[in-house]
């Protein structure tokens, strides 16, 4: 694959969270954020005139918790949640989800190594602590979705999610690219999981660049070895943009909230 260039001033930057900005952890709530990351994202937001968004499988409130005090434009739950700069979070409703929860809770009771994670309009079953249970999880999800309406399964790294049908990270990126300040820019999306492939396809269709974090088959054009390499590239790009002779004073200021505004992630 070709070498990843530094971020240009005309970039619309889209970043996955887990496995991209942050290293993966045994459980979602145990993820740690590198101390310098928030400052780097703030600088990038300013130098890109606000054209930076986080595109994640997590709920947006959890992203706010990890990245506080920043409240960046974001798409959560693979596009089922959406927030423009400083705006309210809009959600794709999933009324068929609640009847499935008792069946999934019974599965977790039967296999205690599994983790059930509620995500407002989605639910995830994690099997990172017991990879041998992948087939059992897949079969259980297929069974509970048999008569569900408006929901679909989304496999990921040691996880299967049930989310609203017809939304994905590619749709979220395409929606951002139709609005200011993202419109008319060159999109770049970095992600690590199979759930990020629609995002890679979307930026390629729009003439942009997909960046895979890790190594596997992908439609992304460029790859980096892991989250540490991705963060290093972000730091170097932020420094280069801020140091540019033509940079001038930043014109965009990210929306920020006081401590504790983001929801602390939990699993059930």
Regions found by a protein language model. Name each.
Residues 58-75, 133-152:
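Substrate-recognition/cap helix-loop segment adjacent to the acidic, metal-dependent catalytic center
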Residues 77, 83-103, 154-184:
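Substrate-recognition "cap/lid" segment bordering the active-site pocket of phosphatases
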Residues 1-9, 61-67:
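Short amphipathic alpha-helices and their capping/turn segments at secondary-structure boundaries
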Residues 32-119:
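Active-site phosphate-binding/coordination module
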Residues 8, 34, 165, 170-268:
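Mg2+-dependent phosphoryl-transfer enzymes with acidic/Ser/Thr/Gly-rich catalytic loops
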Residues 114-132, 151-163:
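Charged, glycine-interspersed solvent-exposed loop segments at helix/strand-loop junctions
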Residues 12, 51-53, 73, 152, ...:
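Proline-centered loop/turn at the N-terminus of a beta-strand
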Residues 6-26, 54:
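Asp-based phosphoryl-transfer active-site loop
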């Amino acid at each position: 694959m070709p070498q990843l260039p530094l971020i240009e001033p005309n970039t619309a930057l889209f970043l996955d969270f887990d496995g991209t900005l942050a290293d993966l952890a045994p459980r979602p709530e145990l993820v740690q954020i590198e101390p310098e990351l928030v400052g780097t994202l703030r600088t990038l937001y300013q130098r890109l005139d606000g054209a930076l968004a986080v595109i994640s499988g997590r709920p947006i409130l959890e992203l706010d918790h990890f990245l506080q005090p920043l409240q960046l434009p974001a798409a959560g739950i693979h596009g089922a949640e959406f927030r423009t700069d400083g705006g309210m979070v809009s959600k794709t409703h999933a009324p068929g989800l609640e009847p499935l929860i008792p069946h999934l809770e019974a599965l977790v009771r039967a296999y205690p190594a599994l983790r059930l994670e509620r995500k407002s309009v989605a639910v995830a079953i994690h099997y990172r602590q017991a990879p041998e249970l992948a087939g059992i999880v897949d079969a259980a999800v297929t069974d509970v979705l048999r008569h569900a309406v408006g929901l679909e399964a989304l496999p990921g790294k040691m996880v299967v999610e049930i989310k609203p049908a017809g939304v994905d990270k590619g749709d979220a990126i395409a929606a951002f690219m139709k609005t200011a300040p993202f419109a008319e820019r060159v999109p770049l999306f970095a992600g690590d999981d199979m759930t990020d492939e629609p995002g890679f396809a979307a930026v390629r269709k729009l003439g942009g660049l997909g960046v895979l974090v890790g190594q596997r088959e992908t439609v992304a054009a460029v790859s980096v070895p892991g989250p540490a390499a991705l963060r290093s590239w972000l730091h170097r790009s932020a420094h280069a943009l801020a140091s540019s002779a033509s940079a001038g004073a930043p014109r965009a200021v990210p929306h920020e909230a006081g401590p504790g505004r983001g929801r602390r992630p939990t699993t059930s």
